Amino acid sequence: MTLSQLKNCQIITALVTPFHADGSINFKALPELIEHLLNNHTQALLLAGTTAESPTLTHEEELELFSEVQRIVNGRVPLIAGIGTNDTRDSVDFAKEVANFGGFAAGLAIVPYYNKPTQEGLYQHFLAIAEASSLPIIIYNIPGRVVVDLHPDTLLKLAQHPNIIGVKDCTNLDHLAYIIENKPEDFLIYTGEDGQIFHAMNLGADGVISVASHTNGSEIFEMINHITNGRIKEAAQIQRRFLPKVNALFSVSSPAPVKAVLNYLGFNVGPLRLPLVACTRQEADAIINIVLDKAPKEYVTKGVLRPDY
């Protein structure tokens, strides 16, 4: 599907990668999982993001995953490919490859991690990716994971490039409000923080790139629908019930919690690849009870890790 269709999508799911017990990709688990997502208000899919455990996927596995998901989806919703690394040349090559591969509305390029570039280095990095191919680029700013923060003014400078179409923002509401207020009119703003959906949408964001939509898509849809129609109190009531679930889904390094819930629901997404490990039985039971409303409301007090899409 096209970029114009992506612009109408408010709930984008960062798809997990199902694995067999031996660590190989379980492609047979994808159709049922994807149908579940599409039936619960997912309007677009992000492939090979961090929730997909992309750091542990080989390039060949990513391409095979792209082909299989495209076959299953069959044009029903737009697809976004995770194409960013901390090597500009590699990111440029991947953007070109995905553009030639076809079938993607955009590519998601993360702020480079580990090598700690300056703002000028970040600007040049994303400029090179944007100019490498016709693939529209969404920048992914998640300083809690990559250490470096793409400053709002650097992002707004990049937003002037016609092939940089949006940002997935995992910073804070001050940052988000600033870029929404000052962005070009057609520049897309997605929060990458499930817990910020209520505030981000009220500030004027276009949607969310979500982990929680794997398990709580109907709640997210209902909340956004209330906001869109001016029913803020009703949306806030959903947000209050939703926050403990988000806390549970990020109480252990993601995507371990969401995989625990999906496995419980019968979707056979399997284990994680090292260095990530599955939740303990005790952790999984607590997470499942909260996320699926199987126990009295309980807040997770250990703290919330920054979502990793």
UniProtKB/Swiss-Prot annotation:
It catalyses: L-aspartate 4-semialdehyde + pyruvate = (2S,4S)-4-hydroxy-2,3,4,5-tetrahydrodipicolinate + H2O + H(+). It comes from the Bacteria. The keyword Iron-sulfur does not apply. InterPro entries: Aldolase_TIM, DapA, DapA-like, Schiff_base-form_aldolases_AS. One of its GO terms (molecular function) is 4-hydroxy-tetrahydrodipicolinate synthase activity. The active site is at Y140, K168. One of its GO terms (cellular component) is cytosol. SUPFAM superfamilies: Aldolase. Keywords: Amino-acid biosynthesis, Cytoplasm, Diaminopimelate biosynthesis, Lyase, Lysine biosynthesis, Schiff base. SMART domains: DHDPS. Its main location: cytoplasm. Its EC number is 4.3.3.7. Pyruvate binds at T51, I209. GO terms for biological process: diaminopimelate biosynthetic process; lysine biosynthetic process via diaminopimelate. The record marks T50, Y114 as: Part of a proton relay during catalysis. Pathway: Amino-acid biosynthesis; L-lysine biosynthesis via DAP pathway; (S)-tetrahydrodipicolinate from L-aspartate: step 3/4. It is found in: Cytoplasm. Belongs to the DapA family. Homotetramer; dimer of dimers. PANTHER family: 4-HYDROXY-2-OXOGLUTARATE ALDOLASE, MITOCHONDRIAL, DIHYDRODIPICOLINATE SYNTHASE. HAMAP family: DapA. Catalyzes the condensation of (S)-aspartate-beta-semialdehyde [(S)-ASA] and pyruvate to 4-hydroxy-tetrahydrodipicolinate (HTPA). This is 4-hydroxy-tetrahydrodipicolinate synthase. It comes from Streptococcus uberis (strain ATCC BAA-854 / 0140J). The gene is dapA.
